[in-house]
């Protein structure tokens, strides 16, 4: 068993697709429905299948992030990722060292609906493993 994808409800599909494309996601499939709703499947380069679904349901009213805390994207170089996102017009936060100097480097960026995305560069020792 494994996680297939997670879905985010978005208020403006065009704006959200532009944001996630700037982050690095690639659109795989778009499914429009007669009621004006749409689903869009995305993945990051290097992923073998869909990892993110954007759900646009205009009839459901305003989008609220609610109890959603964040999701994380592993990056090879946090500095290069921050530079690329900034050049694309996004506003990633300053690098942080939440685990101290030997831990991961992180930064945060927020999507148009307020969903927080953590960008993580693991130290040379790698990501933590759990048995």
Regions found by a protein language model. Give the residues of each.
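N-terminal beta-strand motif that seeds the catalytic metal site of vicinal oxygen chelate
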Residues: 1-17, 68-71, 123-131
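Core segments of cupin and vicinal oxygen chelate
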Residues: 2, 7-49
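Helix N-cap motif at beta-to-alpha junctions
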Residues: 12-13, 75-79
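Short amphipathic alpha-helices within nucleic acid-binding modules
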Residues: 19, 79-84
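Vicinal oxygen chelate
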Residues: 30, 82-131
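Exposed loop/turn and edge beta-strand positions of beta-sandwich/beta-sheet ligand-binding modules
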Residues: 36-38, 67, 103
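Short hydrophobic/aromatic beta-strand element in the GNAT-like acyltransferase core
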Residues: 39, 72, 106-107
């Amino acid at each position: 068993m494994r996680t297939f994808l997670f879905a985010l409800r978005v208020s403006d599909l065009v704006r959200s697709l532009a944001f996630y494309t700037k982050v690095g996601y690639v659109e795989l499939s778009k499914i429009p429905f007669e009621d004006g709703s749409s689903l869009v499947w995305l993945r990051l380069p290097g992923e073998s299948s869909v990892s993110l679904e954007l759900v646009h349901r205009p009839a459901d009213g305003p989008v609220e992030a609610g109890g959603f805390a964040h999701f994380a994207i592993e990056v090879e170089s946090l500095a290069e990722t921050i530079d690329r996102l900034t050049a694309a017009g996004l506003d990633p936060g300053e690098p942080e060292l939440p685990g101290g100097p030997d831990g991961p480097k992180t930064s945060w960026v927020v999507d148009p609906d307020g969903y927080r995305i953590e960008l993580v560069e693991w130290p040379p020792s790698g990501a933590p493993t759990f048995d």
